[in-house]
UniProtKB/Swiss-Prot annotation:
TM region(s), chain numbering: none
Subunit structure: Homotetramer.
Recorded coiled-coil stretches: none
E.C. no: 2.7.1.21
Protein name as it appears in the record: Thymidine kinase
NCBIfam families noted in UniProt: PRK04296.1-5
Family: Belongs to the thymidine kinase family.
InterPro entries membership: P-loop_NTPase (IPR027417), Thymidine_kinase (IPR001267), Thymidine_kinase_CS (IPR020633)
Gene that specifies this protein: tdk
Primary localization: cytoplasm
Organism classification: Bacteria, Pseudomonadati, Pseudomonadota, Gammaproteobacteria, Enterobacterales
Length: 198
């Protein structure tokens, strides 16, 4: 029975690496996968899922207007699809997450979504919000803060390397713009810590 999976983490936890490995595992068994990535994420080229360790794969693009169920139903009728993998799933809309649940429930195709849970302000992305609510399986991929604790927050950095807490939710960037940290160091960087009482 197919399920909807949400693999989430802060940045640089190996989400794209895990996605590419999962796709390879299916393909190695002669199964067909379809890999998607967000149209707005062009850090490594358009229509490419790329990992920091050098793995990459061509990918179909989605944007806010893409009807994923319609596209996948058509693909599946043409040639059966064994697994759908979505990179940068935080950029999905509520309707697209609903459509992916229909791909699982009506077409019986497993859907594996990989993305960030929260933005640099600590707020959920739309796609992450609905995946946390509707996914059958939630899997946290872990990365490490500079202090050694689990990093579960993302800091956005300005051109001088200072943490910022204001601005557009989506600004595409890599290690020059974002760093994953633990909650304690997130609060320290943004000046959100409580003063110790004497």
């Amino acid at each position: 029975m197919a399920q909807l999976y949400f693999y989430y983490s802060a940045m640089n936890a190996g989400k794209s690496t895990a996605l590419l490995q999962s796709s390879y595992n299916y393909q190695e068994r002669g199964m067909r996968t379809l890999v998607f990535t967000a149209e707005i994420d062009n850090r490594h080229g358009v229509g490419i899922v790329s990992s920091r360790i050098g793995l990459s794969s061509p990918a179909l693009l989605f944007n806010r207007q893409t009807s994923l169920f319609e596209l996948l139903e058509k693909e599946h009728r043409t040639q059966p699809v064994d697994c759908v993998l979505i990179d940068e799933c935080q950029f999905l809309t509520r309707e697209q997450v609903n459509e992916l649940s229909d791909v699982v429930d009506q077409l019986d195709i497993p859907v594996l979504c990989y993305g960030l849970r929260t933005d640099f302000r600590g707020d959920l992305f739309s796609g992450s919000h609905y995946l946390l609510a509707w996914a059958d399986k939630l899997i946290e991929l872990k990365t490490v803060c500079h202090c050694g604790r689990k990093a579960n927050c993302v800091l956005r950095l300005d051109a001088q390397g200072n943490a910022v807490h204001e601005g557009e939710q989506v600004v595409i960037g890599g290690n020059e713009s974002y760093v994953s940290v633990c909650r304690k160091h997130y609060k320290i960087a943004l000046g959100l810590t409580r003063k110790e009482s004497v």
